[in-house]
């Protein structure tokens, strides 16, 4: 594989520049004036006499036309200076060197190119120093990352601006306005996390927590049979362009290390991984050959690269495995099945559970967050809410306290496949046993009958559990259960889950959520077609669907669409009724009613009139 051809392939496929109808804007910090917090701004037609609409924007520098993108150099490491300025980190004098097993022993033309060495420094905590966002928060310190998050969450709303709180939040504590101090308090209590490895200098900080906007994650990554560096970097940029707040690299084939390096260096969103996948590649795919030393080495490798959160299946304990024997679909988590196989082969307790304190100490030195994996999640609605699932969940609650003791941030992973009437119980159990640590769920899928449409079956459950309190939703694409998603599948999954997350925010009564809906509703009623397109989650698709039947520019000002036509448009008729009422005398309605009443009496006061 030629490195220059690979770079060229990536550069030609990624999308840059703003989303149609939008522009990139920034807001500076007050505590940290050097901060530039990004937003997507959509200006509406002057006839609306309305201010622009501000939308949360995780797309990074790629949507800013003023920034020159060079994939080979990676994104600017603007956060690095903030991390170093705190004085709590030191450069690693002897960073870990890349080994053949890190890339699955790939050689020659099968070895993906390394990310070019650009002089990046690798850091870890100084002995005895605070370095995690949780430790800073507990010490009463507001970090630059915390102010950054507060600004992002407010969507440029002013603190004294009145807001409408129309929703049911099920006991959450969502404020009218997010302050840096509120962010600090939520982090200190463990109710939110800011996944932000000190070695991810390219990161634009974000928060995951019940009292913040619901976030979504997109999964990418190669497999043993498909995908390249170019494919995965392109998917990363594409996913964040359409709204992915974090991205997980779930690569399982060769070249895991090199592909991950390209992804992190070009990512402004937090990157998560499942380290056991790479550890398994290092032992040639034989689960029984896994051991603590290989896993520990993999953790350090990924910490130094800049991975922001790890999914670790430490809750798959030996006593729980027999509980899955009578399930319809058994153990469906890849990480869970790997650890279950190891436990049974050795008839020993899960070494991730037994070595959990040591794992915490490694992660603490780099501020890598836990995403405690649900290795026993249900893979079918028939298996939902069983004893295996909830036994693991209770264990994750115990491990949460251990991680917090070490100063490490934690979120909890959840199911899976759960019918609608069982979803609320999942949220209730998680809050009860996991001490309000953020919940991060895969859907859940609410039915098993729709291969090819599981982005829809899961978005139903995602919207519900997001409303109940889940902090982040892991997307599902149309290819779920069928194959590796391509570029189009990634976009479909992201858009579907942004919709579910926003629906949850709206239902919870998030103070800024309804502003977006109201803006597009007014545009729809006033037939401002361009505003309707531009304010949507996917302006390109909205415009395409409209133009398939009404393609002319004149149709962009028409007071109808192709569904109802000019005579039957309900909104056009409503406008005519409104205009008629506005043009009549104040008592015209009463006079009209009196006229009809007199006519009724003249006809004999009969409800039904006889025909001639």
Swiss-Prot record:
One of its GO terms (molecular function) is phosphomethylpyrimidine synthase activity. The keyword 4Fe-4S applies. Its cofactor is [4Fe-4S] cluster. Binds 1 [4Fe-4S] cluster per subunit. The cluster is coordinated with 3 cysteines and an exchangeable S-adenosyl-L-methionine. Substrate binds at residues 219, 248, 277, 313, 333-335, 374-377, 413, 440. [4Fe-4S] cluster binds at residues 561, 564, 569. Disulfide bonds: none annotated. Keywords: 4Fe-4S, Iron, Iron-sulfur, Lyase, Metal-binding, S-adenosyl-L-methionine, Thiamine biosynthesis, Zinc. InterPro entries: ThiC, ThiC-associated_dom, ThiC/Bza_core_dom, ThiC/BzaA/B. The keyword Iron-sulfur applies. Zn(2+) binds at residues 417, 481. Changing residue 417 to A: 5-fold reduction in catalytic activity. Pathway: Cofactor biosynthesis; thiamine diphosphate biosynthesis. One of its GO terms (cellular component) is cytosol. It catalyses: 5-amino-1-(5-phospho-beta-D-ribosyl)imidazole + S-adenosyl-L-methionine = 4-amino-2-methyl-5-(phosphooxymethyl)pyrimidine + CO + 5'-deoxyadenosine + formate + L-methionine + 3 H(+). It holds the Pfam family ThiC-associated. Its EC number is 4.1.99.17. One of its GO terms (biological process) is thiamine biosynthetic process. Changing residue 481 to A: 5-fold reduction in catalytic activity. Catalyzes the synthesis of the hydroxymethylpyrimidine phosphate (HMP-P) moiety of thiamine from aminoimidazole ribotide (AIR) in a radical S-adenosyl-L-methionine (SAM)-dependent reaction. Homodimer. Belongs to the ThiC family. This is Phosphomethylpyrimidine synthase. It comes from Caulobacter vibrioides (strain ATCC 19089 / CIP 103742 / CB 15) (Caulobacter crescentus). The gene is thiC.
């Amino acid at each position: 594989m030629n490195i220059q051809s690979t770079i060229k392939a990536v550069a030609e496929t990624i999308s840059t520049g703003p989303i149609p109808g939008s522009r990139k804007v920034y807001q500076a910090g007050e505590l940290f004036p050097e901060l530039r917090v990004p937003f997507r701004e959509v200006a509406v037609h002057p006839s609306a006499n309305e201010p622009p609409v501000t939308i949360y924007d995780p797309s990074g520098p790629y949507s800013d036309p003023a920034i020159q993108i060079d994939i080979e150099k990676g994104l600017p490491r603007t956060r690095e200076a903030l991390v170093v300025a705190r004085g709590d980190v030191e450069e690693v004098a002897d960073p870990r060197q890349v080994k053949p097993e890190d890339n699955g022993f790939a050689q020659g033309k099968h070895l993906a190119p390394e990310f070019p060495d650009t002089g990046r420094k690798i850091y870890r905590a100084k002995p005895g120093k605070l370095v995690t966002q949780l430790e800073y928060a507990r010490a009463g310190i507001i970090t630059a990352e915390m102010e950054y998050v507060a600004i992002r969450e407010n969507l440029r709303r002013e603190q004294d601006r009145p807001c409408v709180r129309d929703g049911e939040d099920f006991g959450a504590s969502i404020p009218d306005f997010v302050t840096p101090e509120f962010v600090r308090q939520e982090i200190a209590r463990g109710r939110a996390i800011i996944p932000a490895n000190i070695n991810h200098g390219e990161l634009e900080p974000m928060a995951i927590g019940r009292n913040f906007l619901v976030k979504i994650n997109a999964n990418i990554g190669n497999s043993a049979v498909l995908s390249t560096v170019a494919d995965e970097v392109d998917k990363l940029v594409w996913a964040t362009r359409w709204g992915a707040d974090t991205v997980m690299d779930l690569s399982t084939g060769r070249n895991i290390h090199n592909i991950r390096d390209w992804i992190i260096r070009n990512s402004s969103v937090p990157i998560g991984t499942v380290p056991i996948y790479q550890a398994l590649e290092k032992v040639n795919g034989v689960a029984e050959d896994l051991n603590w030393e290989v896993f520990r080495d993999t953790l350090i490798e990924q910490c130094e690269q800049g991975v922001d959160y790890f999914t670790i299946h430490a809750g798959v304990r030996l006593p729980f495995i027999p509980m899955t024997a009578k399930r319809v679909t058994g153990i469906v988590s890849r990480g869970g099945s790997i650890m279950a196989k190891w436990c049974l082969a050795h008839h020993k307790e899960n070494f991730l559970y037994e070595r959990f304190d040591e794992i915490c100490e490694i992660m603490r030195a780099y501020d890598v967050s836990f995403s405690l994996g649900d290795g026993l999640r249900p893979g079918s609605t028939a298996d939902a809410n069983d004893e295996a699932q909830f036994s693991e969940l209770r264990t994750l609650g115990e491990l949460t306290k251990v991680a917090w003791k070490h100063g490490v941030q934690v979120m909890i992973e959840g199911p899976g496949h759960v019918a609608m009437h069982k979803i609320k119980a999942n949220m209730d159990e998680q809050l009860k046993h996991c001490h309000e640590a953020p919940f991060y769920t895969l859907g859940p899928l609410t039915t098993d009958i729709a291969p090819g449409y599981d982005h829809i079956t899961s978005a139903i459950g995602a919207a519900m559990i997001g409303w109940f309190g889940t902090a982040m939703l892991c997307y599902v694409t149309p290819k779920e259960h069928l194959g590796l998603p391509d570029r189009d599948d990634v976009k479909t999954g992201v858009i579907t889950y942004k919709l579910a997350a926003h629906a949850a925010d709206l239902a919870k009564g998030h103070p800024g959520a309804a502003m977006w809906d109201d803006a597009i509703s007014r545009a729809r009623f006033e037939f401002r077609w361009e505003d309707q397109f531009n304010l949507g989650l996917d302006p390109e698709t909205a415009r395409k669907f409209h133009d398939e039947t009404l393609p002319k520019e004149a149709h962009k000002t028409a007071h109808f669409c192709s569904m109802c036509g000019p005579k039957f448009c309900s909104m056009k008729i409503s406008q005519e009724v409104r205009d008629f009422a506005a043009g009549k005398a104040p008592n015209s309605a009463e006079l009209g009613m009196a006229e009809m009443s007199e006519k009724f009496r003249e006809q004999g006061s009969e409800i039904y009139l006889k025909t001639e």
